[in-house]
From Swiss-Prot:
Top EC group: oxidoreductase
Binding site for NAD(+): 10-11, 36, 81, 116, 314
UniProt GO molecular function: glyceraldehyde-3-phosphate dehydrogenase (NAD+) (phosphorylating) activity; NAD binding; NADP binding
PROSITE patterns referenced in this protein's UniProt entry, alphabetically: GAPDH
Chain's role: Catalyzes the oxidative phosphorylation of glyceraldehyde 3-phosphate (G3P) to 1,3-bisphosphoglycerate (BPG) using the cofactor NAD. The first reaction step involves the formation of a hemiacetal intermediate between G3P and a cysteine residue, and this hemiacetal intermediate is then oxidized to a thioester, with concomitant reduction of NAD to NADH. The reduced NADH is then exchanged with the second NAD, and the thioester is attacked by a nucleophilic inorganic phosphate to produce BPG.
Highest taxon in the source lineage: Bacteria
Entry's family note: Belongs to the glyceraldehyde-3-phosphate dehydrogenase family.
Protein name stated in the entry: Glyceraldehyde-3-phosphate dehydrogenase
Subunit and partners: Homotetramer.
Organism, as annotated: Helicobacter pylori (strain ATCC 700392 / 26695) (Campylobacter pylori)
Length: 332
């Protein structure tokens, strides 16, 4: 399987690291190119030295438009001119979010496109599906362009799918307690859209927006107009937490809810949902590959209401789902 990565920021680099890690035990994924307009000497340095995920266990260097990782050589570019031979291009730049702009990759020769973000603009949802691996990826019908949704949607969708099937969700509210990201400011500096995101990310708790709950119906259609939420950005480099409050049609005691989630973690959602029984904190989940990690002691119920809290590495977990989805699209 031949993969091309466009955009070599936090997610692009994590995707490559995830592929390298998998290829150590099962070498089936070939990255045949990476594109980013930045300086490749610096990008090579950032791949090897990561403040969150640590030092890559192989030496990385750049030479003559090649990223050299140990004995592996990957062609790199500052612009894309040809994608012939590419099975799946994973779009990680954050620049191209409308499906029509992603069609340019098909014109350049790529067979399929996977977007590492929700789609923007108006589009045909059947032609351009939003898929969450483990929840609705089986709805894939060989479409050429797919959105992998957001890291937060990947975290809440497995939980909502299980509880809606068992208890029927009437409505819900989400708070994602989210590590700060590159769309925030290191010091107080004007943000183009959001006053609060203009404030120093590492010094403040910053309420802002999230589309994860509103977009959930694209993955679970029966939850349309039933979910809302917001984000609270916190001074943490990585790992976030969902605080999901749901009002159910049926009374939902704590133990049966936790039992359902534990059962799913061992079965249909193995590798996607994990259970934490050790009362861990955020730094313990750095580089955890699951979409969400549920802490059963943080499940609370009151009559028909339930609150569930779950951790997720918003970089590494999501990047692993991108690789899973790319492989699924290729083998379809």
């Amino acid at each position: 399987m031949k993969i091309f990565i466009n955009g070599f920021g936090r997610i692009g680099r994590c995707v490559l690291r995830a592929i390298l890690e998998r290829n150590d035990t099962n070498p089936k994924l070939e990255v045949i190119g990476i594109n980013d307009p930045a300086n490749w000497e610096i990008l090579a340095y950032l791949l090897e030295h990561d403040s969150v995920h640590g030092l890559l266990p192989k030496e990385v260097r750049y030479s003559n438009y090649k990223l050299i990782i140990g004995s592996l050589e990957i062609p790199v570019f500052n612009s894309i001119k040809d994608l012939k031979g590419v099975d799946v291009i994973i779009e990680c730049s954050g620049k191209f979010l409308e499906p029509k702009t992603l069609e340019n990759y098909l014109l350049l020769g790529a067979k399929k496109v996977l977007l590492s973000a929700p789609f923007m603009g108006e589009y045909d949802e059947k032609q351009y599906p939003t898929l969450v691996y483990g929840v609705n990826h089986f709805c894939y019908q060989n479409q050429a362009i797919v959105s992998n949704a957001s890291c937060t949607t990947n975290a809440i969708a497995p939980i909502c799918a299980i509880l809606d099937k068992a208890f029927k969700i009437k409505e819900g509210m989400l708070t994602t307690i989210h590590s700060y990201t590159s769309d925030q400011k290191l010091i107080d500096l004007a943000h183009p859209l959001d006053k609060r995101r203009s404030r120093a990310a590492a010094s403040n708790i910053i309420p802002t927006t999230t589309k994860a709950a509103l977009a959930l119906h694209k993955v679970l259609p029966n939850l349309k107009n039933k979910m809302h939420g917001h984000s609270v950005r916190v001074p943490s480099l990585d790992v976030s937490m969902i605080d999901l409050s749901l009002f159910l049609e049926k009374k939902a005691p704590k133990d049966p809810i936790n039992d359902l989630l534990i059962e799913a973690s061992k079965g249909v959602l193995k590798g996607v949902l994990e259970i934490d029984l050790k009362e861990r904190v955020s730094s313990d989940f750095i580089s955890n590959p699951h979409s969400v990690i549920i802490a059963p002691d943080l499940t609370f119920t009151l009559e028909n209401m339930v609150k569930i809290m779950g951790w997720y590495d918003n970089e590494w977990g999501y990047s692993n789902r991108l690789v899973d989805m790319a492989q699924f699209m290729y083998h379809y």
